[in-house]
């Protein structure tokens, strides 16, 4: 389906292609079609593998570093833990059973999605590398969906109930779905696990303001959109160099930023 759409756009003599790959491991047909027409391609969101990006000098990528988002989410957890430690011990409001390790659930975005894999791997390794023991109770693939995360949390709760101390979500929407489940079950806020998201959506920022989500990592989608437009415009009007003769970078990544209650308002103004 996506290949057919690309073929149609090329037949309509487009100047530049902007493509969010359905399958990041299989871009070759799109690249071959664009190459035959000599039309540059800017991939965004799903980053193709390096070997594919290097197939041609008119291939570009705009997005963010999923590894960084996982690291920052882990750092947010560590900062909260360090700020609430009692005599070097994990805070009792987090380590409820007092066993010296954190029992956690993880909500993953999508099976095989690079961002999902990287966010999961790096948030866990960041916390563990800082010397905090973790015990994964379960994980759930909720496809970035608030409704799906709520449903899966409702299914998991009877099994684990008060054992869950920490919930790490690959995005805000799934974190919000978890919060919805706790609201529906009727668990009071001070008895809930610490919940962390990624993306800094409007609803996610509102949850931080209310205190139902502890923190998130801001994904600068507006900045990515502007970069995508700027590069597409340059390629269509000037070629592979900008107005000063500087070659356009093949990879443009916008940085993530930490968001918590003390600074969420500055990100709200960027919505």
Ranges and model annotations:
Residues 2, 61-99, 149-150, 200-204, ...:
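Hydrophobic alpha-helical segments within soluble ligand-binding/sensing domains
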Residues 1-72:
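Alpha-helical recognition/docking segments in bacterial nutrient-uptake
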Residues 12-16, 36-41, 57-58, 101-103, ...:
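Loop/turn elements at helix/coil->beta-strand transitions in domains of secreted/extracellular proteins
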Residues 65-69, 73, 94-126:
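Extracytoplasmic ligand-binding site segments that recognize negatively charged/polar headgroups
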Residues 6-7, 16-36, 122-123, 135-205:
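Hydrophobic alpha-helical
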Residues 8-16, 20, 33-37, 47, ...:
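Structured segments of extracytoplasmic/periplasmic soluble domains
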Residues 166, 180-222, 226, 230-248, ...:
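Exported/periplasmic ABC-transporter solute-binding proteins
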Residues 96-111, 223-271:
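Hinge/cleft segment of the Venus flytrap/periplasmic-binding protein
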């Amino acid at each position: 389906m996506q290949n057919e759409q690309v073929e149609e756009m090329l037949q309509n003599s487009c100047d530049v292609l902007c493509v969010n790959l359905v399958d990041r491991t299989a871009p070759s047909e799109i690249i071959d079609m664009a190459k035959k027409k000599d039309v540059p391609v800017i991939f965004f969101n799903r980053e193709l593998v390096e070997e594919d990006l290097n197939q041609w000098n008119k291939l570009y990528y705009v997005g963010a570093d999923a590894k960084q988002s996982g690291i920052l989410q882990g750092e947010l957890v560590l900062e909260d833990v360090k700020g609430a430690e009692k005599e070097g011990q994990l805070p009792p409001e987090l380590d409820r059973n007092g066993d010296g390790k954190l029992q956690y659930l993880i909500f993953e975005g999508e099976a095989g999605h690079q961002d999902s894999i990287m966010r999961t791997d790096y948030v866990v390794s960041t916390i563990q590398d800082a010397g905090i023991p973790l015990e994964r109770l379960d994980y759930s693939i909720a496809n970035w969906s608030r409704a799906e995360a709520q449903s899966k949390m409702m299914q998991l709760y009877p099994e684990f109930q008060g054992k869950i101390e920490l919930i790490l979500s690959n995005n805000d929407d799934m974190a919000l779905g978890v919060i919805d489940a706790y609201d529906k079950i009727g668990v009071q806020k001070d008895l809930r696990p610490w919940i962390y998201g990624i993306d800094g959506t409007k609803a996610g920022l509102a949850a931080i303001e209310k205190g139902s989500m502890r923190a998130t990592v801001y994904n600068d989608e507006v900045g990515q959109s502007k970069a995508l437009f700027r590069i597409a415009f340059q390629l269509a009007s000037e070629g592979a160099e900008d107005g000063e003769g500087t070659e356009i970078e093949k990879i443009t990544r916008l940085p993530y930023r930490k968001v918590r209650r003390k600074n969420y308002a500055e990100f709200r103004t960027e919505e």
